[in-house]
Amino acid sequence: MNIKIPRIVIGGTGSGVGKTTIALALTQILRKKGLKVATFKCGPDYLDPTYHSRASQKICHNLDGWLMGKESVLNTFYQACHNVDIVIIEGMMGLFDGHSPNSEIGSTAEIAKWLASPVLVVLDTRGMARTVSAILKGLKIFDPDLNLAGAFANFTGSPSHIQLLKDASTEVPILGGLCKHSEQTFPERHLGLYSASEENVSEEKFNFWGEEGEKSLEVNSILEIANSAPEISIPVSNINTTLKRCKIGIAMDSAFHFYYEENLMRLRQAGAELVFFSPLSDSKLTDVDGLYFGGGYPEVFAPTLSKNKSLLNYIQDLSYKNIPIYAECGGLMYLSKGIKLVEGEFFPMLGLISATSIMEKKLKALGYVEVTTKKETIFGEVGLRFRGHQFRYSDLELDESNPIELVYNLRKRKSDQVSEEGYSKNSILASYIHAHWASNPNLAEGFVQSCLRK
C-alpha cells in the first residue's frame, strides 16, 4: 500500500541537545493551528513517549530498527497515522548512532531512510558561531542518501545569536531554535525524565516551550519540508483481530507504565481484552485470566505498594490458582520478596519470586539483548527468540534455599557471551528484559493461549 503523509524526523548531534523540547514545541504549535499530530520516538525509550502523548493527545509509538525490523517499523507507522495531518518523529542519541560504530543499523538515520522522511537536526550551539556550518556540512555529506533538510539551533544566548547562526550556515538552513531557560527544563531522575503523567511535570512547562517555539521557529518552512516528504510503500500485514477470548490485567499507574504500545496492540489482536488497574490504589481485579506487570518506578513508590495489602493478597491468591503472570524489570521487582532501597530501608512485596530486589547507586545494566527460551514458558515452546532492552539500577539477591528456574539464554547485542536470566515458577515468567513483541509475533499469541488454559 502506498501512502503520502507530511512528516519530519527531528534528529540531533547527540543526546541532551534538546530534541524532545523542539518536538514538543512543534507539536503544540501545530495542534494550536488545528492539525492532528501523530508522534513517534526512535529507540527503546519509555519516558519521552509519555511527553509526546501528552502534547499530541495521541499515543506515541516507538520505532526501533534493531528491535522491530523494517517491516514492523513500517506497519507500526502506518497503523498509527490514520486520520492525522502530520507526523513528528523524534530521534535518539546522535543522528547516526545505533547498533554499531560502523553502520546505521538501529539509528535515527535508518528510520528516516526507511520512512523517506526529511530530517531536521538539533544542535547545541552554546558558544558557537560559524562552526555550525562546518558541522551541518559534515552531517549532510556523511550520508548523501539522507534528506537533511534543515536544522535547529538550541541553547542559544539570545535571538541575535540565532540570527548569527542562520547567517553562518550555508549548507543547511537553520529554521530557528530555543534559547537557554534552565528553570523551565523538565525534571529528571535516575532513569531519565520523570513520566509526563506525574504531578511535578506541570502544564506550565509544556505551554512555555510551545510559546517559545511560536516566537523562534520558522513553522511555515517546517511545514513545507514536511509536505515535501514523498509517497512511501508500506508492506501492510493482513492483521485480523481475533474475537475477545480472555481478559488480561495490565498494571498501569505512576509505579508501572513502561510498555511498548506494540505489545499491547498485539495482545488485543490475539484476542485479549486489556483491563487496566493500579497496584498503588486498587484493592482487587475482576475476572482476569492473566496479569502483565511492565516496568516503571516501584522503588519510588515502594511504601505505597507495600501498604496495599489487599491487592498483594489478591494477586498472591491468583498466582496460587496458576493464573499466568508476566513481569518485566519493575514488575519483576514487585513480584520479588521485597525492595531494599539504597538507604537500606526494606519494603515487602508479593514474594512470588524467591529473591530480593536491591537498589544500587550505580547503573547495573544497559543495552539491547537477544533472548532464546531454553525451556517452555507462558510464551510458548522451547527455542523462542526475541529481542529486548534493559536499563536498571537494581539487582536480584537470590534465595539459595529456594532456587529459581532460569529459562532465558541471554546474549548482549555486542557480545557472543551467553548468560542465564528469566525467572520462572509455575505460571510466572519474570525478567529484567523489556521484550519488544514485534521481534517475535508468537509471544502475544503464546501468552493469550496460556491465559486460556489457566
UniProtKB/Swiss-Prot annotation:
Residues 247-442 form the GATase cobBQ-type domain. Pathway: Cofactor biosynthesis; adenosylcobalamin biosynthesis; cob(II)yrinate a,c-diamide from sirohydrochlorin (anaerobic route): step 10/10. The active site is at 329 (nucleophile). It is an enzyme of class 6 (ligase). GO terms for biological process: cobalamin biosynthetic process. GO terms for molecular function: ATP binding; cobyrinic acid a,c-diamide synthase activity. Keywords: ATP-binding, Cobalamin biosynthesis, Glutamine amidotransferase, Ligase, Magnesium, Nucleotide-binding. It catalyses: cob(II)yrinate + 2 L-glutamine + 2 ATP + 2 H2O = cob(II)yrinate a,c diamide + 2 L-glutamate + 2 ADP + 2 phosphate + 2 H(+). Its cofactor is Mg(2+). Its EC number is 6.3.5.11. The a and c carboxylates of cobyrinate are activated for nucleophilic attack via formation of a phosphorylated intermediate by ATP. CbiA catalyzes first the amidation of the c-carboxylate, and then that of the a-carboxylate. Belongs to the CobB/CbiA family. Catalyzes the ATP-dependent amidation of the two carboxylate groups at positions a and c of cobyrinate, using either L-glutamine or ammonia as the nitrogen source. Comprises of two domains. The C-terminal domain contains the binding site for glutamine and catalyzes the hydrolysis of this substrate to glutamate and ammonia. The N-terminal domain is anticipated to bind ATP and cobyrinate and catalyzes the ultimate synthesis of the diamide product. The ammonia produced via the glutaminase domain is probably translocated to the adjacent domain via a molecular tunnel, where it reacts with an activated intermediate. This is Cobyrinate a,c-diamide synthase. It comes from Leptospira interrogans serogroup Icterohaemorrhagiae serovar Lai (strain 56601). The gene is cbiA.
